């Protein structure tokens, strides 16, 4: 495989959806290249036998995730692994000088204790003693943590729901324009958000022609959203978050409801707030008043489409966001973080125009 000095990227968990999307985005990237393919189940196999639909130069072999081998050929590592696995590999890579972007939830919480509570199922088989590493990891939302990401050794890429929900919400928390109580998030995602491992709820016969809520109380992403929201707002926040599974492969739509502190603010005023915050962020597009985002518009892109409306009758602010859950919600955001870490423009090599229809 061709490599670029200073931009060699190992992809661990290469055959999962996150890994596949990462590899696809790195193909043809002007400053980064794939240097190592890691995967336990497919170790020893040629890439063409694992993913014939995504050919790579020289048809490399998939290898076990040996830290020494990864460090010998890589500057960065993207870990696209189930929760509870990245925390075992990341410290070994960091010790060897490899900078890590983790797509799982293992380092998203500042507090290890909170992670152990939220991810109790995974934590039961682990003996994590890396509280200091958790607190030092940078939350990988580039539009909000860009400088910290650029200098980071370990970046924890946000979940897809937190990304879509926080992007429109944070500007209004930062400016103190909304009440911090009573925030409600209603989000809908496609089946690819469940990953590539077979699950009954994701079967065509189960998911097709049906929309269903899940994780209605205590979904894991609730506390992740609250953590970042509290950091920006500077005060305690408890919000309501309900995700829904919809019968499509990819895409995520989040609608956020909050009460304005100034009922005189208009949709035009609130749109200006978003435009001012995201003016210099090419991976965000703020739509004009009255135009509401559709998931198809963001499909196959690393762009977040944002829109806002004000209900003068109720005093409610309605924020809308559409992303591709596998790109801006996962792999694309990971590459966006590596771009910053490598000293590149954040949007380098990332698709910003959708395939439509």
From Swiss-Prot:
Cross-referenced Gene3D superfamilies: Dihydrodipicolinate Reductase, domain 2, NAD(P)-binding Rossmann-like Domain
Record family assignment: Belongs to the NAGSA dehydrogenase family. Type 1 subfamily.
Pathway annotation from the record: Amino-acid biosynthesis; L-arginine biosynthesis; N(2)-acetyl-L-ornithine from L-glutamate: step 3/4
Compartments (UniProt record): Cytoplasm
Keyword NADP: yes
UniProt-listed Pfam families: Semialdhyde_dh (PF01118), Semialdhyde_dhC_1 (PF22698)
Entry GO CC: cytoplasm
Active-site residues, Swiss-Prot/TrEMBL: 160
Database matches in SMART domains: Semialdhyde_dh
Class in the EC hierarchy, top level: oxidoreductase
SUPFAM superfamilies for this protein: Glyceraldehyde-3-phosphate dehydrogenase-like, C-terminal domain, NAD(P)-binding Rossmann-fold domains
Main location: cytoplasm
EC number of this enzyme: 1.2.1.38
GO MF annotations, alphabetized: N-acetyl-gamma-glutamyl-phosphate reductase activity; NAD binding; NADP+ binding
Species, as recorded: Synechococcus sp. (strain CC9605)
Catalytic function, reaction form: N-acetyl-L-glutamate 5-semialdehyde + phosphate + NADP(+) = N-acetyl-L-glutamyl 5-phosphate + NADPH + H(+)
Function (record text): Catalyzes the NADPH-dependent reduction of N-acetyl-5-glutamyl phosphate to yield N-acetyl-L-glutamate 5-semialdehyde.
Disulfide bond entries: none
Keywords: Amino-acid biosynthesis, Arginine biosynthesis, Cytoplasm, NADP, Oxidoreductase
Protein name (database record): N-acetyl-gamma-glutamyl-phosphate reductase
GO BP terms, alphabetized: L-arginine biosynthetic process
CDD domains in alphabetical order: AGPR_1_C, AGPR_1_N
């Amino acid at each position: 495989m061709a490599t670029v000095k200073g931009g060699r990227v190992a992809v661990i968990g290469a055959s999962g959806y996150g890994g596949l999307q990462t590899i696809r985005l790195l193909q043809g990237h002007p400053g980064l290249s794939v240097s190592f393919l890691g995967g336990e189940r497919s170790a020893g196999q040629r890439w063409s036998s694992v993913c014939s639909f995504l050919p790579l130069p020289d048809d490399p072999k998939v290898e076990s995730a040996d830290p020494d081998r990864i460090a010998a050929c890589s500057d960065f590592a993207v870990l696209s692994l189930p929760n509870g696995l990245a925390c075992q590999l990341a410290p070994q890579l960091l010790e060897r000088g490899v900078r890590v972007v983790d797509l799982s939830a293992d380092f998203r919480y500042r507090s290890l204790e909170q992670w152990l509570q939220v991810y109790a199922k995974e934590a039961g088989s682990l003996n994590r003693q890396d509280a200091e590493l958790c607190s030092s990891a940078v939350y990988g939302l580039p539009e909000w943590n860009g400088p910290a990401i650029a200098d980071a050794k370990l970046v924890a890429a946000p979940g897809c729901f937190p990304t879509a929900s926080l992007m429109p919400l944070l500007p209004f928390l930062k400016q103190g324009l909304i009440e911090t109580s009573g925030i409600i998030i209603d989000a809908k995602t496609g089946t690819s958000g469940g990953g590539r491992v077979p699950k009954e709820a994701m079967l065509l016969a189960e998911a097709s022609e049906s929309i269903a809520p899940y994780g209605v109380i205590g979904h894991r992403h609730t506390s992740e959203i609250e953590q970042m929201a509290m950091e920006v707002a500077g005060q305690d926040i408890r919000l309501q978050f309900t995700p829904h599974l919809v019968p499509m492969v990819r895409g995520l739509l989040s609608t956020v409801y909050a009460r304005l502190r100034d009922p005189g603010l208009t949709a035009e005023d609130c749109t200006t707030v978003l435009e001012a915050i995201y003016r210099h962020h090419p991976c965000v597009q703020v739509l004009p008043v009255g135009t509401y985002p559709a998931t198809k518009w963001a499909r196959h892109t690393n762009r977040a489409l944002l829109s806002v409306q004000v209900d003068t009758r109720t005093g409610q602010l309605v924020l809308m966001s559409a992303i591709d859950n596998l790109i801006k919600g996962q792999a694309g955001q990971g590459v966006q973080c590596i771009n910053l870490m490598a000293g590149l423009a954040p949007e380098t090599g990332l698709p910003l125009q959708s395939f439509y229809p």
